[in-house]
Structures are given as C-alpha cells and as structure tokens.
Regions:
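Surface-exposed, low-hydrophobicity beta-strand/loop segments enriched in small/polar/acidic residues
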Residues: 1-92
Length: 92
C-alpha cells in the first residue's frame, strides 16, 4: 500500500482548495444553524461533483470519514459551500 503525506486546506467560501491531482482522505465541516452543503468538485466550478455532504441545521462540527485510499481527484479540488462556516479537507 502506498503512503503519502497528508496535508490540509481550509476554505470559508467557494474556490479551489487544492490546485493539483490528489486524493481527499477526510473532511471536517463547521456547520451553521442553517442546513447547508459542501460539494467537492474535480475540474473547477463546473467540474464533476465527487463528494457531496449535506449538513444539518445545527451549529457544530461534522467529521466525514472517507475509507481506504480516499476519493481521487484527477485535476484539482474545488469546493462549493452553502450555509457552512468553514470546511477543512485532508488530502494527499
């Protein structure tokens, strides 16, 4: 099994989180008191949605476990956030 360093990036608005091909290995979302979502796309704002996380209408922290080798993004990792305070992506 190949091992790589795990890095992190945090965003509070839509945008590119990782500007290269990678694997997303985990996600932490700081939710607000309004239901929302986080969509991670491969290929920019119009790219393919690879991970969608719907968040509850409760302020707090939501950790998303991604098994095995993670989810592969071939181009980049772009985040589209709705009604969340922040999202941290663990990748490598």
């Amino acid at each position: 099994m190949m091992q790589t360093d795990v890095l992190s990036a945090t965003a509070t608005a839509d945008g590119t989180m990782v500007d290269q091909a990678t694997r997303v290995r985990g996600i932490t979302v700081t939710t607000s008191s309004t239901a929302g979502s986080v969509v991670l796309k491969d290929g920019g704002s119009t790219g393919t949605a690879r991970i969608t996380v719907n968040t509850p209408a409760v302020a707090g922290i939501q950790n998303v476990f991604i098994p095995a080798e993670g989810v592969r993004f071939f181009t980049d990792v772009y985040v589209d956030v709705t009604n969340v305070a922040s999202v941290t992506v663990f990748y490598g």
